[in-house]
């Protein structure tokens, strides 16, 4: 049995030219985690390609997603939303979903809000990987409105039946970070977050029990994928995080791995 000491809690193996081969390579490198998808159709194709890996590996999960970019550019419409809501019961893992209010996508903000609220309402008791660009406050408002999060409320794994919200590559304000922490959210950290002054400050503030790692790789459909490079990336992120937090690397590595296992196996 493969022993996993690293977990990539937000990757896009379905972007790889060979999704199954990418998942096998991750396992062989000792990396577990959560593979996000960007549309319900991509999820179903990936679930077929990864069936064997998902069955044999309790530390590797596939999330059903509907990325806000695909809504914003019209690639996905009402049918995709209906599919995700209808099939959400198939999996405990939802992602990548969320909101992106960057200027180039501002015109679709109301559509994004409506869709995100509907998906959130269908996602109670699940593990969610959430994309929130210039929209963390709105995302938290909408999740609170449907009972996914609440200040001071226990989240998985403390409450096995509860929801676990993971902010992927958090880029909100300090006030929004404090609110998300109070709501019990998790945060998956990647090198781009660590490359900014604000991101590094956030890594020092996030409670240890809410820290996760991510690669966000491959970066786009058809991009080549190298699991060994992912391992090196995750290791480098951990080293940087340990330096920032002034803690032992081995201790932080085990805690982040334990956080991930609790979500994946819960």
What are these regions (language model features)?
Residues 1-266:
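Mid-domain alpha/beta scaffold segments of enzyme catalytic cores
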């Amino acid at each position: 049995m493969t022993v996993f000491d690293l977990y990539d809690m937000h990757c896009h193996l379905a972007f790889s030219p060979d999704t199954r081969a990418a998942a096998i390579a991750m396992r062989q490198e000792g990396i577990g985690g959560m593979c996000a998808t960007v549309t319900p159709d991509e999820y179903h194709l990936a679930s077929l390609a990864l069936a064997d890996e998902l069955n044999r590996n309790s530390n590797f999960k596939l999330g059903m997603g509907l990325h806000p970019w695909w809504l914003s550019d019209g690639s996905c419409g009402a049918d995709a939303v209906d599919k995700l809501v209808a099939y959400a019961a198939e999996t405990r893992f939802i992602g990548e979903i969320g909101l992106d209010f960057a200027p180039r996508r501002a015109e679709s903000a109301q559509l994004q809000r409506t869709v995100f609220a509907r998906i959130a309402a269908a996602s109670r008791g699940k593990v969610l990987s959430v994309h929130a660009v210039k929209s963390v406050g709105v995302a938290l408002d909408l999740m609170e409105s449907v009972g996914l999060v609440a200040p001071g409320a226990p989240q998985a794994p403390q409450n096995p039946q509860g929801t676990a919200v993971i902010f992927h590559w958090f880029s909100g304000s300090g006030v929004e970070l404090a609110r998300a922490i109070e709501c019990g959210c998790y945060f998956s950290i990647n090198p781009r977050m660590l490359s900014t002054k604000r991101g590094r400050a956030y890594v020092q503030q996030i409670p240890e029990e809410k820290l996760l790692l991510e690669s966000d790789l491959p970066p786009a459909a058809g991009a080549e994928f190298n699991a060994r490079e992912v391992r090196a990336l995750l290791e480098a992120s951990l080293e940087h995080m340990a330096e920032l937090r002034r803690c032992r690397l081995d201790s932080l590595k085990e805690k982040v791995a334990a956080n991930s296992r609790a979500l994946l196996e819960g």
